[in-house]
From Swiss-Prot:
CDD domains associated with the record: FMT_core_Met-tRNA-FMT_N, Met_tRNA_FMT_C
Matching PROSITE patterns: GART
Binding site for (6S)-5,6,7,8-tetrahydrofolate: 113-116
Role noted for this protein: Attaches a formyl group to the free amino group of methionyl-tRNA(fMet). The formyl group appears to play a dual role in the initiator identity of N-formylmethionyl-tRNA by promoting its recognition by IF2 and preventing the misappropriation of this tRNA by the elongation apparatus.
EC numbers on record: 2.1.2.9
Keyword terms: Protein biosynthesis, Transferase
Protein name: Methionyl-tRNA formyltransferase
Recorded name of the encoding gene: fmt
Amino acid sequence: MSKPLRIVFAGTPDFAARHLAALLSSQHEVIAVYTQPDRPAGRGKKLTASPVKNIALENDLPVYQPASLRNEDAQQELAALKADIMVVVAYGLLLPKFVLDTPKLGCINVHGSILPRWRGAAPIQRSIWAGDEETGVTIMQMDEGLDTGDMLTIATLPIEPTDTSATMYDKLAGLGPNALIDCLSEISAGTAIAEKQNDELANYAKKLNKEEAKIDWAMEATAIERCIRAFNPWPMSYFAVAEQNVKVWHAVVEAENQGKAPGTILSADKQGITVATGKGALRLIELQPPGKKAMKAQDILNSRREWFELGTQL
């Protein structure tokens, strides 16, 4: 029989907030919440609280927002809470050894991949771009490495051919909380089994950058289409035409590139704008010109057909 645990929760974005909400509905006691300091957001650059902070305040939980946990005062503040365990979900701060060792049962982390594959900052995006057929969440006992701790629970789900990083994020945000509650029950009951990661199978999901988002038409159409889904909603794949960057929200793979050079426009009609690639072709269905909302190909052709004349090289 598991007993309630005294939990310190550390997290920042909506993904983390959903895990905090699940903990608040469980038998366990959340005694404090750590989250990133408020950041400027929106056009007015107004200081804005994180989704995790908002939930914590709604539930009258103490909130701590240190800029770093390497500070001795911050560490002593954490130690004074006398937590059984610290649950970390997309917190955004490195935890030094003192912090990892402070809770009675250490710190556990919810990571958005099937470890040891895709350790690091962008596991959801990298798994889609790589063409992985499944992903999931791994709950691990944290150590000083980057996502290298022993694995306690793994929950998986398929990556569908239409999934974007946005849809996958939502799916994992639904999968993770249940896995977390199950894991905590096992930890509390003393039945959790920790499995070491096989470092030989590990790879790293480095942060995305805008330079990667520029479409390379020399790649295979299937790889470009995965890239478009992986980079949705940020930073969004794009191509340049008439010295303007046009974002691509949705595209489908076509088998035939008509023997044309990569980047050549093969057709442009209400079905989409078809572009030759290194292997096959890509039909662009939904696009976003600068300063505009996303629109169907037909709509952009109505206003900018000169950008997409047949034979034009992107």
